[in-house]
Amino acid sequence: MEEAYRQARKRGEQGRRRAISQSEHPYLTDLDSLVAQLPCGQRENIGLRDIPLEMVVGTVTKGRQSAFSCNFMPLLPWNTEFARKWSNLYDIQISEGYRDPIIVTEFMHRFYVQEGNKRVSVLKFLDAPTVSAKVTRLYPGKWDSVESRLYGEFCAFWYVCPLYEIEFSREGSYEMLAKMLGQDLVEKWPQKKVDYLRHTFLLFKRAYLRAGGDHLDITPADAMLVYLNVYNQDRLLDTPTDIVVNRLCKIWRELVIAGKNDEDKVDLVEAPSVDEEESPAKSTSGMLNFFMGKTVYSAANPLRIAFIHEFPCATSSWDSLHDQGRQYLDEHFGGIVRTEAFEDCHDPDVFYAAVETAVKHGANVIFSTSHRLMEYTLRAAVEYPRVRFLNCSIGLPHQSVRSYFGKMYEAKFLLGALAASMADNHRIGYHASVFASGALSEINAFAIGASLLDPRAQIILTWGDVPAGGLAEAMCREGVSVMTGVDMSKSLEDPTAYGLHRLVDGKVAGIAMPVWNWGRYYELIVRSLLHGTWDETADDQQVRAVNYWYGMSSGVIDIRYAPGLPYQTRKLVQLLRNGIVEGSINPFGGELHSQDGVVQIEGFPPLPSTQIVEMNWLADNVVGTIPQLDDEPKVRAL
């Protein structure tokens, strides 16, 4: 009995000294002092619950605060009444266990003891996982901070799945977990589903801590969400712990990135290096000699690249354009690079079979050409760490897979100016099929471009699919004479479904369209591999995701005019285009206004690229709204 108390007190002193050395409070936090500085809301009686002891962090009042270290271990000497009571409670717990619950207040997903501090101390000393408690929940008075919003999401989760152990540090994670399990945050979950999640989480947490997860800046629940994003088809309860630990080691860099602030997760590479820009076509000694001494690859030992397309190239214009880029590589690099393509790989089994075949064929690099293939690509990248994987998307922070996309907002800025120069009534239509990362920057750049030529221009924004040949009907319905459709039609047979058009005598006539030059884009990425500059892009000491985000200045984005466009109009757009390429014009520089007010005032530099990718507002001359996640089934990251 005495020995147990002395050991507990020793741990208490160690915890107190450690806290002092780290400039932290050495004693228990008291809730009264905490809420005195914060506005609080109503209280709710939660009732009798088993709560995780690791979430019991303090007392309600200051009364016993200095009797315990910050780790809840005792600090008072052995020859005190406090020590004797603690020891008696220790004996009871060892011999028969406690029968009466403690009384706690829950505040912001943590528990503060009103009655039963010494029992908590004994149980923590014995490494007990939970304690029975009568719980009263104290709500925050305001919900305008990240912490309070996260707690609000937890409360919504708790009411349908009453598990305290699941704690996330990122907004939206509870809803994501619910969707993974086929549930929502509205209807109460079946008890079997609650029990399954509890057991699954506890199993995962043990494996996560065994792998060293306590050294990361994420919660075990955060880590489980990352794990399930990669191994989502595996039931954790059926997976041996050793395998889970091994998988965690494979995705360790993904876990590290998950703990970073949003601004530290991704390196946006916005321009190729000088070596990548240098053109082998200008070499008088030929393609092979141009790379001689600069690369380990040759005609006898080529760089092998596989392209995995979501749909057949014969029916999908998006996949067809990417495959044209693939064919350009074969022609351009004269045997140093050899490619192969796998089509119609939207099914996961077909995708993984394609990856396996590509690896057997010696693929050094694998491109997946649709954002919808990122989930499969990530898992494949984890399984084949020696193969370089890239996915056509932007804004997805994965260290195992590099992303690449284009600054389409630059082309949309030009199309907006062009649309305003040809609109009849200040009303211009903008149709978007999906809400995606980058979609709002494209809409706003279009609106800003239009406002340069017509300050009264209004952009009528609509979302959803347009039936083949239905653009004219959509334009009449919205009362616009000029409208831009989606960037790429699903069908090669419907060329009027995308680009900028005007309505003439009830028929749609093309004006201009944005152009992707995927051959150029793939050429720039492949040069980094041939020149050996690929690894220079990423700093191994700073684990970050790499997203290539090239634009007009790199030659990967442009616009194409329809025949018959007046030369004066082409000249105007060309002036704006030159400004973008040279860097003297940026749609998001200077004064900016959203539907809700001023974004930034005159004289400010252009918005940082990360803010452009993650833009969450609409320009003040846009008539329309941003779809909610629940309302828009096609929400995605590009």
Predicted regions and their residues:
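Periplasmic-binding protein-like
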Residues: 362-371, 390-392, 480-489, 508-516, ...
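Glycine- and acidic-residue-rich phosphate-binding/metal-coordinating active-site segment common to enzymes
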Residues: 107, 114-179
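Short, charged/polar connector segments at secondary-structure boundaries
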Residues: 1-118, 125, 170-182, 190, ...
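Hydrophobic alpha-helical segments within soluble ligand-binding/sensing domains
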Residues: 404-426, 515-536
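Flexible loop/hinge segments that line or gate small-molecule binding clefts
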Residues: 382-405
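Extracytoplasmic "Venus flytrap"
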Residues: 306-324, 329, 342-348, 436-440
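An alpha-beta-alpha
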Residues: 326, 414-457, 540-563
